[in-house]
């Protein structure tokens, strides 16, 4: 019995490995649009796909980021300035992409732009602190997708949305986790709706990686600003010692982030170039062996594990 079961599992993984190794033809003729290319995953992916001969359309937030990327890549790669929080910027970028791809359409749309800071407890935030997180991570992503979807449909191409392991299990992260849960839901619904048009949607779920977004000093600096602006009754409820411990723990964990960004960009590249891309990619060892397995545990057990791993607020019950 066990022999047959192990054999079946082995054959399944062998078949999956073979299918996923099949590569889309004529990659050199395919256009890929990537948001958030100033640094981090987007920047590395743009260079990676450029080296592979694909036609990369890289969206950067700043002209400085765009210029630095152009200096590191071939003449095939083109850049455009895009602020995903501004509708007029998205409309202009869509027209720019349309002029370049023509009747071929857009093979790949990679929604990579994202923000993390400030990193705090939900009660500490003001609307002006958390709204930008939603505007970039979720609203911007949906608007870019809807605006460019007709170009992707024309190419029967791919949409790759960058979520997070914290979009599968909300251990911490305040509104960052909330925004990434939204990305997961949007991507799942979108995948169902566009599959009849030959469009495939993949979700990338990175663990903890060292990028500008996870810069420890900048994160703590912005977290302190949120705390300082919080009402006095909230500060008294948690206590200064609790906040200091929270900052120390956050900084310590951010310092552990992996520097191997290719673990993420390789997943993105596979989603764009394999004839059989995965629906979800868990990128990073912490995502594969901690966050994702934790998401399958009973909520009561996860709550207990979190409760014993952190300190108590000053006015805890």
From Swiss-Prot:
Residue numbers binding substrate: 164
Source species: Mus musculus
Major place of residence: membrane
Membrane topology, as annotated: Peripheral membrane protein
Tissue expression notes: Detected in liver.
Record comment: activity regulation: Inhibited by carbenoxolone and phenyl arsenoxide.
Protein name (database record): 17-beta-hydroxysteroid dehydrogenase type 6
Annotated TM spans: none
Annotated NAD(+) binding sites: 33-57
Biological classification of the source: Eukaryota, Metazoa, Chordata, Craniata, Vertebrata
Gene3D superfamilies: NAD(P)-binding Rossmann-like Domain
Residues of the active site: 176
